[in-house]
């Protein structure tokens, strides 16, 4: 699941692996706290995922670049410092340029520091692979996380409000067609949505495995 550099590795397969097989939510089952908390809308999902993607790329790149010079006794503290540096950049940029989104995401922006996805990729991949492939891994995992948060946020926002309108752009408006279920924008809706999606994903994987795929 977390390979060292192999002769048969290529950037495209590594990128796709992060979106599909090792998807942070449906493959590795990591980072569920922000996934549950911030996916009340597509806008929130995009904001959190883009921030996490930036931190993933930056921390993977930096950890991979300095990995041979990090003593084992201080490995984790060094990784946390690196991650916290990039999270601070995200926090300051969001506060300056997207204040409404910054307020909406709240404490979950600084909590990216301890997001299992970011720490997990630094530990399991960046420490064992070169800079280029560590960046590719981060892009794949970050893109997979982005797609999942958009999907979950879209489902919850549509069923909870009848409208999907990220950043003021109305993409779907079914307010006059469906009766919004407000609980979908609350915690029970988050658990229900993720449970249904995980059930579908696991069922499809079992079907594929049964067919020898």
UniProtKB/Swiss-Prot annotation:
The keyword Ribosomal protein does not apply. The chain crosses the membrane at residues 25-45, 46-66, 77-97, 100-120, 135-155, 181-201. Keywords: Cell membrane, Electron transport, Membrane, Translocase, Transmembrane, Transmembrane helix, Transport. InterPro entries: NqrDE/RnfAE (IPR003667), RnfE (IPR010968). It is an enzyme of class 7 (translocase). It is a multi-pass membrane protein. It is found in: Cell membrane. It comes from Methanosarcina acetivorans (strain ATCC 35395 / DSM 2834 / JCM 12185 / C2A). This is Ion-translocating oxidoreductase complex subunit E. GO terms for cellular component: plasma membrane. Belongs to the NqrDE/RnfAE family. It holds the Pfam family Rnf-Nqr. The Rnf complex is probably composed of eight subunits, including RnfA, RnfB, RnfC, RnfD, RnfE and RnfG. Disruption phenotype: Deletion of the rnf operon abolishes growth on acetate and ferredoxin:heterodisulfide oxidoreductase-coupled Na(+) transport. Part of a membrane-bound complex that couples electron transfer with translocation of ions across the membrane. Catalyzes Na(+) transport, most probably coupled to electron transfer from reduced ferredoxin to methanophenazine and heterodisulfide reductase. Involved in heterodisulfide reduction during methanogenesis from acetate. Its main location: membrane. Its EC number is 7.2.1.-. PANTHER family: ELECTRON TRANSPORT COMPLEX PROTEIN RNFE, ION-TRANSLOCATING OXIDOREDUCTASE COMPLEX SUBUNIT E. One of its GO terms (biological process) is electron transport chain.
